[in-house]
Amino acid sequence: MPELPEVETVRAGIADHSLGRSVRAVRVVDARSLRRNLPGPAHFEAALTGRALRGAYRRGKYLWLTLSEADGALADEALVVHLGMSGQLLVRDEPDGDVGSESGGESGNESEARASFDEQPRHLRVALELGPVGATSAAGATGGAASTNRASTNRASTGQRLLFVDQRIFGGMFLSPLVPDVPAAVAANKVAPGEVAAGEVPERFLVPEAVKHIARDPLDEFFDPAVVRRKFLRTSSGIKKVLLDQSVISGVGNIYADEALWRARLHYAKPARTLSAAQTRELLEAVTQVLRESLAAGGTSFDALYVNVLGESGYFERSLNAYGRAGEPCHRCAEAGRTSLMVREPFQNRSSYRCPHCQRAPRSR
């Protein structure tokens, strides 16, 4: 399943290539991918057509695109995308038609470009036909922080297709009203004083209603470790189960939970409330580090199901210390001159990977 680094890589790609483009048409190939858009496919098509993609935002594993009305005003709802287990958002730029032969016919390169543009990917579920870049977009953001990415860097004067591809159909697209979600520190004027005034809520503090229950993730500028610590202290659940709870800390899935727990030398079943303040701090630092490192590598691609908007794979799997390494030596133990092989153990209908020496099981009570 795509986790925070993979979704952020897709968000950045959309911000780079698609913002400022108006939606000329919507083609729903498989309505199952719109099951969370309760008014149905016809409403989805009508609501998007004529609006422009304004900003690209993310919280945890959720991505959303704010929209501009024809007059440039911010629309009161956003397009939410959840990639599920196998979802992809792909960008296809329309050939500009400037590369013709002297006789006026198509060149081989242009013909190939047109064929690539017209090709329908396998498992295509929804296609947005986008126009050239206009003047109605506002910059998108990660977790609400400002960004200057615009589609002007990539064939801004030609059309584009934004394709939602999903093999397993666990993901989907839907429209959700925007609601305020002002960080406590901002509301108290401790940071960004005056930014929220006279009832005006900036776009970066608006989230889709369907996403508001999702906790802030470690790459969010307003992520508060103290809030997470308090949630840890209220539960006796194992720490990995808590890390996967998107209402506690978002964006962390099975891969990065195992990687962070390995770095913090914690067993996945250790009750969250038994972590000391220092252990909590070390774990959250490990989570943040592994997410940042994976993001820098373009995410983790074990197969063709995860790619960025241009269809390119990430390569963080080359740097994994725990996940998928059952039977291989623990890197940390090997550096210390010890021999300890990583083990794979069942965990909630999936697997956990750990070092039996570095990450000892908690004592039974």
Roles of regions detected by a PLM:
Residues 1-365:
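Structured catalytic/nucleic-acid-binding cores of DNA maintenance enzymes
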